Amino acid sequence: MPIFKAKRLCPEAIIIRPKMSLYKRISNIVFSKFNQLTPLVETIALDEAYLDFSGTYQLYKKAPAELLVELALEIEKQLGITISIGLSENKFLAKLASSFEKPRGFTVIGKSEKLEFIKNLHVKNIPGIGPSLKKKLEKNSIMTIDDLRKLDKNVLAKSFGIFGKTIWNMSRGIDERNINPASSRKSISKETTFEHDISCLLYTSPSP
């Protein structure tokens, strides 16, 4: 929620300025722990990443779930913060799993249960389905991932091109994207949200 809306709803609210340098320092510590476990870390944001644990059992003699539990406990003990973890066979399912039971959540989506897990979720949970495509799908009575899964692959390809194949796969719990450390990005952003959309922004810097 934008700050101006929060102030309108709660005029007596005390707004605390963010401590960006602290957030970045803590993030660096957490990500260094990720990289100690596996070199395959794809950073999405200061507080989000994908980790690939393929082959790590030979090194640690521990299953990924055990390593992640130990990691979460170590981070909470050392830094006083909790992390939410999603463990599954691909990015889509792992990201989905991480959104459940926050904070301090740890959700696993196994191969045999993935279709049952995702079937009743709204199609908006599939990466790449934004407001516009969501509206088009809903217009055609496609509300859930299970609704999408029942469609013919060629129909989706005809309607949405190559992305049609992608969402057809994801409706079956299939995600062909690899963990790509080279594409990692980590940033802190500062935004100004206006009450109405504008087409030209002339000045954005605050006064000194």
Model-derived segments and spans:
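Long, highly charged, low-complexity intrinsically disordered interaction regions
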Residues: P64, L68-L121
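Residues that scaffold, gate, or flank divalent-cation-dependent active/transport sites
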Residues: M1-L46, Y50
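Generic non-transmembrane alpha-helical segments
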Residues: I29, K33-L37, E70-Q78, K136, ...
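DNA-contacting surface of Y-family translesion DNA polymerases
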Residues: N125, L133-S205
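Catalytic palm subdomain of template-directed nucleic-acid polymerases
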Residues: L51-L68
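Short, conserved phosphate-binding/catalytic loop or strand-edge motifs used
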Residues: L46-S54, E89-K91
